[in-house]
Amino acid sequence: MNLVLENVNLNSNSGPNSFGQKLFKYMPSLGVSFNNNPEPDAYLCFIESGRPTYNAPLYQRLDGIYFNSEFDYKTQNSNIKRTYELAKGVIFQSQFNKELTFNYFGPHNNYTIIHNGADLNLINSIQNVIIGKYENVWSCASSWRPHKRLSENIRYFLEHSGKNDGLIIAGDVQDKIQHERIHYVGNLGIDKLFSLYKASKYFIHLAWLDHCPNVVVDAMACGCEIICSSAGGTKEIAGSNATIVQEDDWDFSPIKLYEPPPLNFANKTRNKWHVNDDYDMDSVSKKYYNFIKDDLDG
């Protein structure tokens, strides 16, 4: 199969692009070639496309849409929706993502849900960093926008950790909360990030209304126990032993995303929403291949 990856920057480590790198690495073993052949078998577009028409079937990988009422979300969504309507098939990252999109764009008649995957071959080749100073290492990593709730991550750590535990925070943080057991390491390359995860017992991701964060899949694959919010799709891939902080259900109405409500940590439970243990990228890439190939052959 000759497949064109569209709207993917293989030199970027952002969430969608890092997943594109994994597909680019794993799908050739299935007989997939990626090039700019003018007559491909299919296009796989990440999120949205700038093309008005296609000379082969288009499949859309949709990792989220806009719903922040403080912005013109309808305009932000317009080209994503156009791509959605052009697509022969749609791949959603999570059940939450599918329900959100159906609510805003209407149902699609050909779709599947494939959760994100981790590069286990790479993870298994990396040694964990030795952090002997602490009995238990906690970690978190993100692009720290307001809805990622860094301050709540820190509050959870301070209220639930032992006195000999430490929290390592990766990513660019503007307003640092200073504490002797909290350490900021900035943006890390993927090898160092995985090394940190492998040294960590817990990974905190209390982001509000996240879809299917790659950092959580990677941290879980590295052996971390996940702590996350019930709001959004993260709970679907956080593992059966994850701790879930329950929030009010959301009716999909536009909201002020960057003003997340405070969390009540008393409302926490084990993960009863977990639906996926198959996060090996080898298996995930086969799901992508089979969805597209079966549809083309059908």
Annotate each language-model stretch with its function:
Residues 42-70:
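Active-site proximal beta-strand in glycosyltransferases
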Residues 84, 195-200:
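Short alpha-helical donor nucleotide-sugar binding micro-motif in glycosyltransferases
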Residues 129-148, 154-159, 167:
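Conserved donor-binding/catalytic core segment of Leloir-type glycosyltransferases
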Residues 208:
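Aromatic "clamp/platform" in nucleotide-sugar-dependent glycosyltransferases that forms part
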Residues 96, 117:
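Carbohydrate-associated surface elements
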Residues 225-228, 235:
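Short hydrophobic beta-strand element within catalytic cores of glycosyltransferases
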Residues 171-194:
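Nucleotide-activated donor-binding/catalytic signature segment of Leloir-type glycosyltransferases, i.e.
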